[in-house]
Amino acid sequence: MKKALICIDYTNDFVASDGKLTCGEPGRMIEEAIVNLTKEFITNGDYVVLAVDSHDEGDQYHPETRLFPPHNIKGTEGKDLYGKLLPLYQKHEHEPNVYYMEKTRYSAFAGTDLELKLRERQIGELHLAGVCTDICVLHTAVDAYNKGFRIVVHKQAVASFNQEGHAWALSHFANSIGAQVAE
């Protein structure tokens, strides 16, 4: 079965210590795991999706405006990939198996062409990494489940600012949507 890695929201605003909506140290601690997974998938010729939250400054109609401070604003460094993932992406961005996509909702599937890209490549297994485990990773996983994809969540490559939410989401992945939670 063909597989893809979906790396979700691993950006400065979500991970850096001065990020606008940072998950803090837990997010920074998974950098090596995310970079290594990304390298592995690229080297093996598997599809790699970098799904990045993207917002317009001052968008009063977006539902997140009422929930969170402005973050991942188009044209800001906050929206850039975090740490060593950025130069890795820049090195491989023109390769056909590397896809950078913007998303405006929690799920990488909502309002995007992600499902089309995966189906065109006959991909049936999705490996998930990134932040936050209990928000965007969770919503992407549930949508993937509802679309019939096999799901693998890499426990060492997901994090959240909310440790209870993180633990709950890991349990939910395994027990409610049948995902493999890989150590």
UniProtKB/Swiss-Prot annotation:
SUPFAM superfamilies cross-referenced by the UniProt entry: Isochorismatase-like hydrolases (SSF52499)
Keywords attached to this entry: Hydrolase
Pfam family, one: Isochorismatase
EC top class named in words: hydrolase
InterPro entries per the UniProt record, alphabetical: Isochorismatase-like_dom, Isochorismatase-like_hydrls, Isochorismatase-like_sf
MF annotations from Gene Ontology: hydrolase activity
Entry EC number(s): 3.-.-.-
Gene3D superfamilies: Isochorismatase-like
Family named by the database record: Belongs to the isochorismatase family.
PANTHER family tied to this protein: ISOCHORISMATASE, PEROXYUREIDOACRYLATE/UREIDOACRYLATE AMIDOHYDROLASE-RELATED
Protein name: Uncharacterized isochorismatase family protein PncA
Species of provenance: Bacillus subtilis (strain 168)
Source species taxonomy: Bacteria, Bacillati, Bacillota, Bacilli, Bacillales
